[in-house]
Amino acid sequence: MPKDSSLQSILLIGSGRSSSAKAAEFDYSGTQACIAFKEEGYRVILVNNNPATIMTDDVHADAVYFEPLTVEAVEAIIAKETPDGLLATFGGQTGLNLAFQLHEAGVLKKYGVRLLGTPIEAIKRPRGGPRTFRALMHELGEPVPESEIVTSVEEAVAFAEQIGFPIIIRPAYTLGGTGGGIAENMEQFLALVEKGLNESPIHQCLIERSVAGFKEIEYEVMRDQSNTCITVCNMENVDPVGIHTGDSIVVAPSQTLTDEEYQMLRSSAVKIISALGIIGGCNIQFALDPNSKQYYLIEVNPRVSRSSALASKATGYPIAALPAKLAVGYTLAELVNPVTKTTYASFEPALDYVVVKFPRLPFDKFPHADRKLGTQMKATGEVMAIDRNMERAFQKAVQSLEGKNNGLLLPELSVKTNDELKQLLVDKDDRRFFAILELLRRGVAVEAIHKWTKIDRFFLCSFERLVALEKQAAAATLDTIEEQTFRFLKEKGCSDAFLAETWGVTELDVRNKRKELGIVPSYKMVDTCAAEFHSETDYYYSTYFGEDERKQPSGKEKVLIIGAGPIRIGQGIEFDYSSVHSVFALQKEGYETVMINNNPETVSTDFAVADRLYFEPLTLESVLDVIEAEQIKHVIVQFGGQTAINLVKGLEEAGVPLLGVTYDMIDQLEDRDRFYQLLEELDIPHVPGLVANNAEELAAKAAEIGYPVLLRPSYVIGGCGMFIVHSEAQLAALIEQGELTYPILIDAYLDGKEAEADIVTDGTDIVLPVIIEHVEKAGVHSGDSYAWLPAQTLTGEEKAKIIDYAGRIAKKLGFKGIMNIQYVIADGNVYVLEVNPRASRTVPIVSKTTGVPLAQIATKLLLGKSLVDIVDEKARGLAVMPYAVLKYPVFSTHKLPGVDPMVGPEMKSTGEGISIAATKEEAAYKAFYPYLQKKANANEVYVIGNIDAELEAEMTAKQLTIVADVPFSDWVKRDTALAVIDLGKEEGEANKRMTALSRQLLVFTERETLKLFLQALDVDHLDVQPIHGWLEKKKQAEQAVIA
């Protein structure tokens, strides 16, 4: 059928701010949906308050609203834009929840807006109405675990007594299993039910008989309005049911199912999507008894999901773009597969390789957090690897995680006893994969490990072969290794770095020997059809099996962009934004773009973005292999975060030409002695600081500087390993804990304002469009700070110094491209804290709110252009912004028991949000609005320690009740509880802060953040405005200044 001509405009709901369980996958799918709608001539209206996304670029939508994802805000947008249709399935659970709320509030009916794709009943049944959903499944003959929906602890207990333990608790309308878990006894059950009811936006939980230990199988299914259904991909979780699929190792296609089991579950998936009437994509999860053919349906996600992005990248099938086309009337048989350009979308993908996904968990940041995995997702991101055999796919996935180990050995586990390792498996610890390998090294039988983990023996035997590879490598040396053995080790995924470590030589030695023997990878194509048809895509993975399948290059000059790898705390979706914009700029300049990355969630790994895409680990070996295979002469590292920067030294030593930066330049900025020397040469003030190489030096030099001091390592991102130390005793305790790495930098801690700026430079001139001022004082990581664009309280003199110092640094270094500089303003001086010779996490928000495309300008400068050629001189100064932009952090620490929500120098946030308004107060209101709306009847704040009279008076004036004399354990359960205030940051009160967070209360440990919140309480309305409206006001203001 042709597209629906009754639609002229479509409102797309984004997924909002990134968090654990909600990362870049929704940016990828949402971007594809916007492009698909624009291709069909529809006017696209987008609401999404995540500034780091590609989808919120004005080229992808006709009107972009950075507004809260609430009924009130979206209704205002609908009234203003009058869309004909609304699509929520690309906004994750956030989008579905909001669509349901708009329907229930009568907003869609009032304005005549049609819900596209997933019908409202399909949204309600799997999540909001388990009774009706279960009835439908029984009608279809589809087995579901015995379950009951409850709205109170009492109802839950009554059902638990009927079915017995273990029991799974699933809160309704949440994402990533938030608030849920498996209870083995009544004590655990009561805690999880109470938490789950609190997390659910409709105060409901599904209480379900546990099928933990069964195989977990997923199907990505697609359906059109003619009821044509296909399965795009089926995936098997290595971990059995009981660990959230987002935290599990996943392989595609499934490896342990018989054909009968595969077809049985496929038929079930098709039957379910048809019965629900879903138009578009759907993720369906099953639990399969490993000892019989009994299965249960455990979850239906009637939307694009994290698994959808994985399935899309695993198969090459455009799983996001096609559902958008289906939603407006097309059928699968009418849509051509853009990969082959000859087959149709109704043709099911086929794989002639294996894909392995590993989760990226945050415990390197939070080693003291509860590392046990369950039904609530904790991962911040993931990596994907492709190869022709299971062992190499596993090894490539581990290499992509960027851990400190070159192979599969975790040193921290090698000192544990067998019983301790077994306990890690029983507890479902995040290190269980490495614990299994350690037990196998010690000769523990596969059968015993299977008994403890319920992981299929097929996978355990594959792990056993990985251990055998280690022994085989250790039995040789670089001089004695036979070609056949060497080739076998490479075929099975042993990295050059691992072999170098094993043989006591350098990685370059191994590489040279390997090339001398002609052992080099070939590159195979991801084509959706297992080479059955000709493919038009340049989407590749490396393997040591078979012939090279790469197409002939275009003849254009090539540039390689190194991506940022998996999303993690400190390095998120913002870096993908910069990478993609660099690709766009290069293509406009006539270059052939080559992207290397390993993150299946991102836009940068969409095969339609760069001219050639390589899905590979971001290791020196893999990057050099691609450079040599493609004969690349230009490499960009500035947009790949610390991942790419850490490769600079090795690439330079290998003779690779890097654009805009050298290792010496980076070292000059990271080595504190050299950095301070640079600043002194330029007459730029810096914070007093010293370097310590051991514990004795650290204690002496900290005393020399005087407390408080800030400790930080070099070459890190996200403030990893940073501490503020207030006393000699606190330092002694840190040294005793053994958590410090040397050499370590010791800076005097200045209690002042913090600011930062992103600049682009050609080595002579700079463009610095806006100064960002942090709300909190220095000492809170920039990624965890609320921040104003433009700066709100800096004087003209302070701004002039910030710009002047940036210009001096850029010119002295001869730096080209983009950099981020951080400052502290204290005692009447402007100090330079640090310079990052790369794109920062603030590039997207600066680019979008000023209209200055920093990443694209920087790319052109890297190619040799000057600012004079690109940016008009009048546009090089600070932007005139007649509006207030507030960047605010998003934390997922409530999903990580044991993590204190107190902010400090080490970054903890997993994402960011944006609010734009005419005044600071309204911008603050928009930032806190979803919380204030949820806690509309709450007015009590619990104070730990003391607060000053000024704050007390202000809170009283805002009609907040201050509580300090009620037992905390009683108060925190009240419906009137709003926030906990602990400005003294009492060390002994961490449990109260964590408990408050688990109850979804605000926790304030910084006076400035609390003041911002109080400002927000003065506002009671929302004014919605698209970004182009704000930029038009900016243009008018700048013209008025010129006039």
Swiss-Prot record:
Keyword check for Magnesium: yes
Oligomerization domain as annotated region, ranges: 403-549, 403-550
Cofactor: binding details: Binds 4 Mg(2+) or Mn(2+) ions per subunit.
Residues reported in the UniProt entry to bind Mn(2+) 1: Q285, E299
Residue positions binding Mn(2+) 3: Q822, E834
Cofactor(s), names only, from the UniProt record: Mg(2+); Mn(2+)
Region of interest (Carbamoyl phosphate synthetic domain), ranges: 550-932, 551-932
Limits of the MGS-like domain: 930-1037
Positions of region (Allosteric domain): 933-1043
NCBIfam families: CPSaseII_lrg, PRK05294.1, PRK12815.1
Protein name listed in UniProt: Carbamoyl phosphate synthase arginine-specific large chain
Species in which this protein is naturally found: Geobacillus stearothermophilus
